[in-house]
């Protein structure tokens, strides 16, 4: 029997959503001439930017800390002299964090929060600004803006169904400007050129930033493909740009002629996530192809082979990662990268074993797969719970782990109940 009250509430919600959509469309039909119109109060903006650096830049690296903060100080002193590309970076940083900054009081506009609504306005304005930029020369700032735009969309669940398409588009953009190639080749190609701007483009600082951004883009694309159920586009590509170094931003100066030596993985830096993640990238990409390619049928022995390789990668994690896996407190800066390193490998154990776990009641050999699925799903949910308990909601918005793991747990319980009843 249909509840009349529930029916009226649903009707009112639909009407409210449609009215807000029309109002939003009218408001955004006017092109924003100056991006600085959308900037928040400096105190509020500084808090959100600091939060971004404590959370987001501990995993996917887009910006260089000293360079950014130097420009931000100049912006605070002389806002009128700030370039539009830096304004776009500020807007997108704020857009990335507005929905997860717990200290802000939540209010609503229509069916969405004011924070999300204003973040989406900034996203749309920056997207429009990017479309008007020349492609003759692509600066490192424009590349950073494109990556931040993608992350901001994911953090605000904006155009969720387009996530994989936009990740693939971002990857193609990176390929088009040669981020996947060895920066040393650029020096050889322009060695005889006297243009100082070109020489500066291949400085040690920019070489490392190119590697970081490329590593970030391929990680985002692989995860988007995994969530969508497609093989990653990176499978058919080869890159020779190398992996990022395990060095902190304070050691990477813009005028550096040479990079300092990369620290061992046991030493945590803000770049540790990308460095350690790159070691298992080929394996994760291969497993993603096996899971999502309908022409591939993985035998159980083959499954156990990939299970063994995945466990080896998990066991090779440095001590600081293992500490966070065992510790319930996830408030430190290194907690998010540590737990994400574990989650992004364990998610493959879940989907590799799931097809066999479904038949555990008919073949006792597959009972192991059911146990692996339960353990993997439970561990992933525990990691997310730790982060949420510490006030960090980043992965909840950026990934689908909680939904996927919860479904796997429910499915396993239902299968177990059906076997019990028989």
Show where each model-derived region lies.
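Amphipathic helix-loop-helix modules that constitute alpha-helical solenoid scaffolds
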Residues: 22, 211, 215, 245-247, ...
């Amino acid at each position: 029997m249909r509840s009349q009250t529930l029916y009226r509430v649903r009707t009112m919600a639909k009407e409210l959503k449609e009215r807000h959509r029309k109002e939003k469309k009218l408001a955004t039909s006017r092109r924003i001439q100056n991006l600085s119109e959308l900037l928040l109060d400096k105190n509020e903006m500084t808090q959100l930017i600091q939060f971004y650096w404590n959370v987001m830049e501990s995993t996917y690296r887009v910006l260089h800390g000293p360079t950014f903060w130097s420009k931000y100080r100049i912006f605070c002193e002389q806002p009128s002299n700030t370039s539009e590309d830096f304004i776009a970076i500020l807007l997108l940083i704020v857009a990335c964090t507005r929905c997860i900054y717990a200290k802000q009081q939540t209010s609503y506009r229509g069916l969405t929060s004011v924070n999300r609504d204003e973040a989406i306005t900034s996203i749309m304005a920056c997207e429009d600004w990017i479309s008007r930029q020349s492609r003759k020369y692509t600066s490192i700032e424009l590349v950073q803006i494109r990556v931040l735009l993608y992350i901001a969309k994911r953090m605000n669940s904006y155009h969720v169904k387009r996530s994989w398409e936009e990740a693939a588009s971002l990857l193609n953009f990176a390929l088009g400007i040669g981020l996947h190639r060895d920066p040393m080749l650029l020096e050889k190609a322009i060695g005889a050129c006297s243009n100082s701007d070109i020489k500066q483009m291949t400085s040690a600082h920019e070489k490392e930033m190119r590697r970081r951004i490329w590593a970030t883009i391929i990680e985002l694309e692989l995860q988007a493909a995994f969530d969508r159920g497609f093989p990653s586009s990176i499978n058919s590509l080869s890159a020779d740009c190398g992996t990022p170094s395990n060095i902190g931003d304070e050691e990477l100066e813009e005028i550096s002629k040479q990079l300092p030596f990369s620290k061992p993985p046991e030493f945590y830096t803000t770049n540790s996530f990308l460095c350690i993640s790159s070691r298992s990238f080929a394996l994760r990409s291969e497993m993603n192809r096996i899971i999502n390619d309908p022409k591939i049928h993985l035998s159980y022995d083959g499954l156990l082979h990939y299970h063994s390789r995945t466990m080896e990668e998990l066991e090779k994690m440095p001590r600081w990662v293992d500490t966070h896996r065992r510790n319930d407190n996830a408030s430190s800066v290194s907690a998010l990268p540590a737990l994400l390193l574990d989650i992004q490998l364990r998610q493959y154990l879940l989907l590799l074993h799931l097809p066999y776990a479904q038949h555990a009641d008919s073949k006792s050999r597959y009972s192991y797969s059911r146990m692996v699925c339960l353990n993997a799903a439970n561990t992933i949910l525990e990691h997310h719970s730790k982060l949420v308990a510490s006030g960090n909601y980043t992965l909840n918005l950026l990934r689908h782990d909680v939904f996927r793991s919860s479904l796997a747990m429910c499915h396993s319980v239902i299968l177990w109940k059906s076997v019990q009843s028989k």
